[in-house]
Amino acid sequence: MLKSPGSVRWWVAAGILLCAFVLLQTMSHGEAIVLRQPLHDLPYALGPWTGEEQPLQDRVVQVAGVSDYTNRIYSQPAETPVQLYVGYYASQRTGDTIHSPKNCLPGSGWDPIQSGYATILVPGGHNIVVNQYVIQRDQNKQLVFYWYQGRGRVIASEYKGKFWMVADAIRRNRTDGALVRVVTPMNDGEDRARIRLVGFTQTLFPSLDELIPN
């Protein structure tokens, strides 16, 4: 029986990830790379935005396996708030690996109904490409941006992220990295929500880039 192209691509991707996992487990352990500063030091005042920490439950942090994290709500007058989550992994060799929001969101009751990419011009004059999702629970919709950041790269694709993690483990003896996710309700429409997340990301990026090791 012939397999569909989509099925073949799935098995190829699964094989690559399995090989990457085996390789990382069999290689000698590299040092865990600590943040330049704890994520708690990320400014609570970002442009017009003011942040408030929203600690996660201990069991959630344990399941995530993060070395450090911050989970905040940023707000400003007369504007819909933005939720920011950054989870940092000093090493991904021992089973604690970055969990894709694409897999975690359905478990929390939010279903992805639209996906794509967004290109954002950040301070310094360069573009970053991030994942863009619209998620829905009942009649509520939210817009999500997320990306993987570390070792001098900002990556949207999970497969590229795994590739570079293995390559850097071999070349640099490093597997550190962070997941960055920003979310905002779409009660004022998708276009307005997108403008809000793009602006917030542009304001956030320089401060975040100072904390995550290159």
Residue ranges and their predicted role:
Residues M1-S7:
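Short, Lys/Arg-rich N-terminal segment immediately upstream of the first membrane anchor
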Residues W10, S28, D58-V61, P106-G107, ...:
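Intrinsically disordered, low-complexity segments enriched in polar/charged residues with Gly/Pro
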Residues W10-Q25:
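Hydrophobic membrane-insertion alpha-helices, especially the h-region
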Residues G15-I16, L42, L197:
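Active-site-proximal structural scaffolding
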Residues A20, G47-P48, A178, Q202:
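Active-site-proximal helix/loop capping residues that flank conserved catalytic or ligand/cofactor
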Residues H29-L46:
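Alpha-helical transmembrane signal-anchor/signal-peptide segments
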Residues P43-S75:
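Short extracytoplasmic
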Residues T70, S75-F200, L204-I212:
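A cross-kingdom signal targeting lumenal/periplasmic-facing segments of multi-pass membrane
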